[in-house]
Amino acid sequence: YIPNSLYNFHPGSHTGQGSDVGIDLTSTMISEVFKTVKNASTKLLSETMAGKGSEIGRTFEEVKQIIDLAEQKFGSSLKGRLGVCLDTCHIWDGGYDIVSNLDGVIEEFDKIIGLENLYAIHLNDSMNPLGAHKDRHEKIGKGHIGFETLYKVTRHPKLCNLPFILETPNEQSGYIEEIKMLKK
């Protein structure tokens, strides 16, 4: 346990039982975590997913359902304790067109989930075209999202103060180069 930290998780899969069952199970597990660790200051972040197979959290609406149901089951507000990590590869692969409509996607996120619930961003390019539902991360500027869009994400006034985490297929030296590119 590290006080005041962020703990990111993938919300899981419904394994053929349907999204509602998966969302219910995930929200139950979140509620149990908070019941067990009552006074922890660590924030639990549900990651946005690409929608491969039977993944849940593949739309902003599903992520919101997970949060709302967890709050309902916990019995009190989880505001400030439960939030979201937005993964650029996942939302692109899930069908959110951040290349052509970054502002629109951010507005949609805000309308459905609320930007006050966004605590971190996984910054990745994607090997796949928009809406492929595959979750294949690519190095910054080498995929279908492209450097220009990812740079805009890091400079966007509604996102620029969040922590950005690279999850690109790289060695240490590759991460150093990507960070240098993004800081220019």
Regions found by a protein language model. Give the residues of each.
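Active-site acidic/histidine proton-transfer and metal-coordination neighborhood
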Residues: Y1-G83
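Active-site-proximal loop/turn and secondary-structure-junction residues that shape catalytic pockets
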Residues: P11-T15, T48-K52, T88-H90, D125-M127, ...
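A structural signal for the main folded, soluble domain(s) of proteins
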Residues: P3, E32, T36-K43, K79-G83, ...
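Conserved, mostly hydrophobic/aromatic
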Residues: Y7, L44, D87, I121, ...
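Gly/Pro-rich active-site loop or hairpin
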Residues: I56-F60, K64, W92-N161, P169
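C-terminal helical cap(s) of enzyme catalytic domains, especially alpha/beta-barrels
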Residues: Q172-K184
